[in-house]
Amino acid sequence: MDKPVKPAXVTKNIGRTGSQGQCTQVRVEFMDDNGNRTINRNVKGPVREGDILTLLEAEREARRLR
């Protein structure tokens, strides 16, 4: 139950998603990995480049926007 959280910095704002545009799709880069791994995530609420997110699940990646 006590999974470690992963800090990730928002590097790029890709666009709005969701049926009414309530989520923002962003590209995040993990701060604790040595390989500089980046994934796309959907974020609810206000977010901009340079923000730090604490991700509870680091393996899940959002589908690409069309």
Curated annotation (Swiss-Prot):
Region (Disordered): 1-20
GO MF entries: structural constituent of ribosome
InterPro entries: NA-bd_OB-fold (IPR012340), Ribosomal_eS28 (IPR000289)
Compartments in which it is found: Cytoplasm, Cytosol; Cytoplasm; Rough endoplasmic reticulum
Subunit annotation: Component of the 40S small ribosomal subunit.
Recorded family membership: Belongs to the eukaryotic ribosomal protein eS28 family.
PANTHER family: 40S RIBOSOMAL PROTEIN S28 (PTHR10769), SMALL RIBOSOMAL SUBUNIT PROTEIN ES28 (PTHR10769:SF3)
Annotated protein name in UniProt: Small ribosomal subunit protein eS28
Organism, as annotated: Ostertagia ostertagi
The gene coding this protein: rps-28
